[in-house]
Each structure stands twice: as structure tokens, then as C-alpha cells.
Amino acid sequence: MIGRIIRLYRKRKGYSINQLAVESGVSKSYLSKIERGVHTNPSVQFLKKVSATLEVELTELFDAETMMYEKISGGEEEWRVHLVQAVQAGMEKEELFTFTNRLKKEQPETASYRNRKLTESNIEEWKALMAEAREIGLSVHEVKSFLKTKGR
């Protein structure tokens, strides 16, 4: 899991594996193995170097939800986390769009993203979020739980 989070931050920063390894002072081979999940227990020293280079808090590398809730401001962070969870768990884009449209009708405040309603015109933004979802493992159960909570 931590490897996927490192990869997500690395890509957001626009770094190649080689660039991150050089700037962090870590082995490119080891970094690659961490990202691919071959090694799943990197040292704290390694994580400190990588997180400093990526300009993220060390704690953010340990928990995908922490990362998503702390990095993004406003109400969209919860949506982003749960969209990522839904797609990672195998929910198809069209199914997710249908689901969120149904929720929009039932609970209008839960179907906004960046203070806008989910529509055909902004579906590309949602698709971009779903692409990020493939980088982080989250569950459909957590999406449903979140949506129930937001609907109260």
C-alpha cells in the first residue's frame, strides 16, 4: 500500500523513479521495488528521505485516507477518497456515474464536486479522479458508508 502512495505522490510531482531516487538519495532499484509492492516494509530513514523530497508529511505515506483528507482542502477530499475506493474495488465508471446521479437526486448536497453538480459536462474531471483511484486501494463499503453519513 505505501508503495502505491509513494508512486501517486511521485507522479503528481512529475518525477520519474530515477529523479526521485537521485533527489532523495535512495536506490532506484529499491524505490522501484517499494512502489511495485515487492518490498512492503521500507525503513523509516528511507521514508523520511522520500517524503522530504516529495514535500509531504511522513504520516501521509502510511495511510491513503489521511493523505487524501489532509492534502485536499474543502469538501471535495471526501469525494475524491471514495471515488478512488469505488474504482479500485472494481466499480465501473458508468456504474459510478449512475450511482452518483441517483444520489444527486436523493441528496443534492452529496453529489457536488468542487461546488458543482455532477453532470455530463464535468464527467471528465470525475474520470481523472477515477484514474487516480487505480493508484490507491480503497473499498466500496467505505464509499457507501461515507455517502450514508453525508446524506444524514
From Swiss-Prot:
Keywords, in A-Z order: DNA-binding, Transcription, Transcription regulation
A GO molecular function held by the record: DNA-binding transcription factor activity
SMART domains in the record: HTH_XRE
InterPro entries: Bact_TransReg_Diox, Cro/C1-type_HTH, Lambda_DNA-bd_dom_sf, SinR/SinI_dimer_dom, SinR/SinI_dimer_dom_sf
Segments forming domain Sin: 113-151
DNA-binding region(s) in UniProt: 17-36
CDD domains: HTH_XRE (cd00093)
All copies of domain HTH cro/C1-type, residue ranges: 6-61
GO biological process: regulation of DNA-templated transcription
Coiled coil region boundaries: none
Pfam families for this protein: HTH_3 (PF01381), SinI (PF08671)
Assembly and oligomerization: Component of the SlrR/SlrA complex.
Role according to the record: Represses sigma(D)-dependent flagellar genes and activate the eps and yqxM operons. Repressor activity is regulated by SlrA. Controls the initiation of biofilm formation.
Protein name from the UniProt record: HTH-type transcriptional regulator SlrR
Organism: Bacillus subtilis (strain 168)
Gene: slrR
